[in-house]
Curated annotation (Swiss-Prot):
Region Disordered, residue ranges: 1-79
Protein name listed in UniProt: Remorin 1.4
Organism whose genome encodes this protein: Arabidopsis thaliana (Mouse-ear cress)
Taxonomic placement: Eukaryota, Viridiplantae, Streptophyta, Embryophyta, Tracheophyta
Biased composition (Basic and acidic residues): 1-10, 68-79
Cellular-component GO terms for this entry: plastid
UniProt cross-references to InterPro entries, sorted A to Z: Remorin_C (IPR005516), Remorin_N (IPR005518)
Positions with biased composition (Low complexity): 25-39
Length: 202
């Protein structure tokens, strides 16, 4: 069992490691550990350090280049992220400002519409009141006009009546004077005397 274990160890160590120093030191440690532990445990333990060292050596060679790129990418990523966050904040702020502006405009429009509506109703009420007053005045004027027309008609009738009375008086007086003239003429004929006044009409 002990012979088989070192063989396995040497085989596994010789394959992955190119340098002779590493396999020489490791088998001794493996030989010390092997009798104490189970035979299955050593093989996975021994090959793992060699690749780790290779990886460390490889990483040591690559370390100066990779971190710079990563740092640059991180810087660029952080700058881009900051720019994106700033743009998002700006867009958010602009959208809030736009929403506020729209709300204020809507509020102003509603307020103006309300005032315009109240002015329109006020105008209509005032116009209706004035038109009602005008109609009332027209009715009063029509009533007064009818009264005045009636009064004028009465006056005209009175004037006509007075004129007729005057005409009748004149006609009566004329008839009386004609009778008087006829009587005097008959008297003058009977007496044979001439009238003192001739051509009284002239």
């Amino acid at each position: 069992m002990a012979e088989e274990e070192p063989k396995k160890v040497t085989e596994t160590v010789s394959e992955p490691t190119p340098t002779p120093e590493v396999p020489v030191e490791k088998p001794a440690a493996a030989a010390d550990v092997a009798p104490q532990e189970k035979p299955v445990a050593p093989p996975p333990v021994l090959p793992s350090p060699a690749p780790a060292e290779e990886k460390q050596e490889d990483s040591k060679a690559i370390v100066p280049v990779v971190p710079k790129e990563v740092e640059e990418e991180k810087k660029e990523g952080s700058v881009n992220r900051d720019a994106v966050l700033a743009r998002v904040e700006t867009e958010k702020r602009m959208s809030l400002i736009k929403a506020w502006e729209e709300a204020e405009k809507c509020k102003v429009e509603n307020k103006a519409e309300k005032k315009l509506s109240s002015i329109g109703s006020w105008e209509n009420n005032k116009k209706a009141a004035v038109e009602a007053e005008l109609k009332k005045m027209e009715e009063q004027l029509e009533k007064k006009k009818a009264e005045y027309v009636e009064q004028m008609k009465n006056k005209i009738a009175q004037i006509h009546k007075e004129a007729e009375e005057k005409r009748a008086m004149i006609e009566a007086k004329r008839g009386e004077e004609i009778l008087k003239a006829e009587e005097l003429a008959a008297k003058y004929r009977a007496t044979g005397t001439a009238p003192k006044k001739l051509f009284g009409c002239m």
